[in-house]
Swiss-Prot record:
Pathway: Bacterial outer membrane biogenesis; LPS lipid A biosynthesis. This is Lipid-A-disaccharide synthase. Its EC number is 2.4.1.182. GO terms for cellular component: membrane. Keywords: Glycosyltransferase, Lipid A biosynthesis, Lipid biosynthesis, Lipid metabolism, Transferase. It holds the Pfam family LpxB. InterPro entries: Glyco_trans_19 (IPR003835). It comes from Pseudomonas putida (strain GB-1). One of its GO terms (molecular function) is phospholipid binding. Coiled coil: none annotated.
């Protein structure tokens, strides 16, 4: 069996999780494999030779990207040339479409097979990107079923592999075990999840803490947990907590334990909303962007929803309070009844979980190797 060289690029923590799972599954099927590209600590632990820190790609929002555009373009140009020189058997771009789609196009033109893992939101906005995907991508791997249908209609080779989170999160999470592990007792608990990026926490952190203070007046005995993605986010939140008397426990990571332990979640739009759905926890989704970014997106976005639970259901399962709607009082008012009883909201969550539970990393590995079988 000849050595396989696989190039991968992931742009943020969720991509690092997907990439490491795919790498493990590829190694199980083809032990003589070398990994190069850009990834985080999980991918590096699986053997990735990372050319530069993944964090340099983790930028959110149109306005925020402009501040780093020169660096991003310079890194991308250098990376394309490095990969053309290395001639990997396949390039796999994991999410980060504004960075990776251009790489895929250039590498495919150079005769390298290309895969994109995690569909960009082309069905929601900037739909013309599908033309670039069709030209630059030998195979699209989607995590969600409605995405695969979209690509089939557009003539792009596609495979729905399911979502790795649906594989790893149990169909029924034990709330009491999670509470014991976190040292939490009985009584109502709300998880506050304002995001993992500095910009997100900057825009949503204090808002969520204000909402928590309002909620204390509406739900007697309520307590809060807030998982921090890293030490920098923890320091950011600790600064916001100064002068407040909230019954709140900060956690280092442990977002899954927080979701398992809680009764309801106040959460930023993003992958974490899918995690909350998979844990069958009722949620209120909130998001704020830089005003100019929001103004532009509002005019571009075709989808009526932003959160994954609503996109998967194709209807409003969970409330979304965005931009000016996301006031602390409105968040508390919407969340309070869900803390008391959110069962009506979560009725469809189990069905969605089972649809997404397909052994994603192995499905993705098989699809990649099938693409390479004639190399």
């Amino acid at each position: 069996m000849a050595q396989l060289c696989v190039a991968l690029v992931a742009g943020e923590a969720s991509g690092d999780i997907l990439g490491s799972g795919l790498m493990r599954a590829l190694k199980a099927r083809h032990p003589d494999v070398r990994f190069i590209g850009v990834g985080g600590p999980l991918m590096e632990a699986e053997g990735l030779q990372s050319y530069f820190p993944m964090e340099r790609l983790a930028v959110m929002g149109l306005v925020e990207v402009l501040g780093r555009l020169r660096e991003l373009l310079k890194r991308r140009k250098l990376l394309i040339q490095t990969l053309i020189d290395e001639k990997p058997d396949v390039f796999i771009g994991i999410d980060a479409p504004d960075f990776t789609l251009n790489i895929e196009l250039k590498l495919r033109q150079a005769g390298i097979k290309t895969v994109h893992y995690v569909s960009p939101s082309v069905w929601a906005w900037r739909q013309k990107r599908v033309l670039k995907i069709r030209e630059g991508c030998d195979l699209m791997l989607t995590l969600l079923p409605f995405e695969a249908r979209f690509y089939e209609e557009q003539g792009v080779p596609v495979r729905f592999v399911g979502h790795p989170l649906a594989d790893t999160i149990p169909l029924e999470a034990d709330r009491s075990v999670a509470r014991a592990a976190l040292g939490l007792g009985e009584g109502p608990i709300v998880a506050l999840m304002p995001g993992s990026r500095g910009g997100e926490v900057g825009r949503l952190g204090a808002l969520f803490l204000d909402a928590a203070e309002h909620l204390c007046q509406q739900v007697p005995g309520v307590r809060f947990v807030l998982p921090c993605a890293n030490a920098a986010r923890r320091a950011q939140v600790e600064h916001m907590l100064e002068g407040r008397q909230l019954p709140l426990t900060l956690l280092d990571g442990q977002s899954h334990q927080a979701l398992a332990a809680c009764d309801a979640v106040l959460i930023a739009s993003g992958t974490a909303t899918l995690e909350a759905l998979l844990y069958k926890r009722p949620m209120v989704v909130a998001y704020r962007l830089a005003p100019l970014t929001y103004w532009i997106l509002k005019r571009l976005v075709k989808s009526p929803y932003v959160s994954l639970p609503n996109l998967l259901a194709q209807r409003e399962l969970v409330p979304e309070l965005l931009q000016d709607q996301a006031t602390s009082q409105a968040l508390a008012n919407t969340l309070a009844p869900l803390v008391r009883d959110g069962s009506q909201q979560t009725e469809r969550f189990d069905e969605i979980h089972r649809t997404l539970r397909r052994d994603a990393s192995n499905q993705a590995a098989e699809a990649v190797l099938a693409l390479l079988k004639d190399r």
